[in-house]
Amino acid sequence: MNDQVIIFDTTLRDGEQALSASLTVKEKLQIAYALERLGVDVIEAGFPVSSPGDFESVQTIARNIKNSRVCALSRAVEKDIDAAAEALKVAEAFRIHTFISTSTIHVQDKLRRSYDDVVEMGVRAVKHARKYTDDVEFSCEDAGRTPIDNLCRMVEAAINAGARTINIPDTVGYTVPSEFGGIIQTLFNRVPNIDKAIISVHCHDDLGMSVANSIAAVQAGARQVEGTINGIGERAGNCSLEEIAMIIKTRQELLGVRTGINHEEIHRTSKLVSQLCNMPIQANKAIVGANAFSHSSGIHQDGMLKNKNTYEIMTPESIGLKNQALNLTSRSGRAAVKSHMDAMGYKEDEYNLDALYQDFLKLADRKGQVFDYDLEALMHFSNLREEDDYYKLNYLSVQSGSVMATTSIKLLCGDEEKCEAAVGNGPVDALYQCIYRLTGYDIVLDKFDLTAKGEGEDGLGQADIIANYKGRKYHGTGISTDIVEASGQALLHVINSIHRADEIAEMKQKKIATV
């Protein structure tokens, strides 16, 4: 049996479903580039029929990603499959992933069909997808709770119809490893044409079993594992791909399989997904948590000093977590900044060096020494900004005491600079009152978070907000050594996104009116 395990990432599809606010096309493309660097075999970029935004995201990713196969999801419905193919056709090669529910509860209560109808729908969907590509994946939704006879029948029929990958999801995270591995083993034993397809698994983490179930499936013969970076996803999340990759690498002698993952990209990819998705990583998270390589016990520290292997089964360097290099200061030139970015593995086309250097100089003037983690934070924030931002903060002054705070700002609105001052319950409240008055947007703030992005009193602070405007949620981010300024940047990030969305909607209306 082939010893290569295909890694199928669904961060941009299943993972995004867990987010408070949808990612922009630009943010999704950033993540797709990171997944490509990581060595992911298949990137599930979205569900094109679900919305124009998802269609555009899939199309953009399919156009730009060259070293990973781009995939789109569709129900077992012809219009879904047509939309997926239309979005993907800009790629040299692509995959269509179609699915239908197979468990008794789903068939009877959700689909309200007979099982014969479900099999026929699945077969029809696979055949229709094959008109567009030979690379068709078929999923039996809720396979973990599907009667085994029905599951075997569906798998055999889908393979006969032309599916080259059969995905067995534990959709509600119900099974345990021995049980799930047994399902995969039974398929290999009972489905006569099983050798004509790759068996894939897609496990959810409702009972904390997703990674263990996936490894059990690999031991039983599955050769594709689906999951997400940091395990993000519906409800309790998905199988964590960085954990799968490091388990296979660390226990290769036991498992006898391998992946094509570039393990030294794990840490960087994890941080990027956490940053853009506004989902902090728990400190004790396996592989990528802040405490993953920490040793506080005296006994453990003694052992580590004598021989690292006493308590360390893998190294921080193996996932790309490197020691801090020499610090940068305001006297450091562009070449020094570029050298640090090169050392961290970033390519020139992943960031704008001129913009990053200007942000670096401002930060260096404020805090003196700038560290690699500061540069990364500045780069991520710089990449989020748009060149055509309509609203820009030109000046900020805060007076705060024991009673009320006063904030004065100058805001560039297009080509016009406007001034405003306000009193509020704290400097951030006063600043937000100023911005609301000058922009005129009626925004409801759902969530406000402040996070330290560096170390020490002069470290960078990141503000993240979730805002609601006309029923749609927006995520805004700001970063600065001044948390009030960071908070203002976050709100302006949201307002600029709303402004762009309004402009696009207005242009569409004008086009419709002229037809």
Swiss-Prot record:
Enzyme class: transferase
Region (Regulatory domain): 392-515
GO CC field: cytosol
SUPFAM superfamilies given in the database record: 2-isopropylmalate synthase LeuA, allosteric (dimerisation) domain, Aldolase
Signal peptide positions on this chain: none
Obligatory cofactor(s): Mn(2+)
Assembly information from the UniProt record: Homodimer.
Name of the protein this chain belongs to: 2-isopropylmalate synthase
Gene name of this polypeptide: leuA
